[in-house]
Amino acid sequence: MSAVSTCADGLVLRLYIQPKASRDSIVGLHGDELKVAITAPPVDGQANAHLTKYLAKQFRVAKSQVIIEKGELGRHKQVKILNPQNIPTEVAALTE
């Protein structure tokens, strides 16, 4: 499975998260996953909440349309974006 794949109702992203980064950004490929750096620390779900907010802003969707399907407690996550209004260039280059 690739880092970015399309499904009937949106996109599925396989992510590697780097918490406590200096700024929020989509870094690029990290093995077979998409690396995303976020400023939030990995404490009490802060990183997941921040990741959801950041991805919602990048894809121009509501936070409720960003679903963490797998990896709630780890750095390796699978996230589904429902009906994205915008696809960042880093992600568009990786779509199948």
UniProtKB/Swiss-Prot annotation:
Alphabetized Pfam families for the sequence: DUF167
Family matches, as SMART domains: DUF167
Gene3D superfamilies in alphabetical order: YggU-like
Top-level division of the source organism's lineage: Bacteria
Any GO CC annotation of this UniProt entry: cytoplasm
InterPro entries named among the record's database cross-references = DUF167, YggU-like_sf
Family membership? Belongs to the UPF0235 family.
What's the protein name? Answer: UPF0235 protein Ent638_3359
User: What organism is the protein native to?
Assistant: Enterobacter sp. (strain 638)
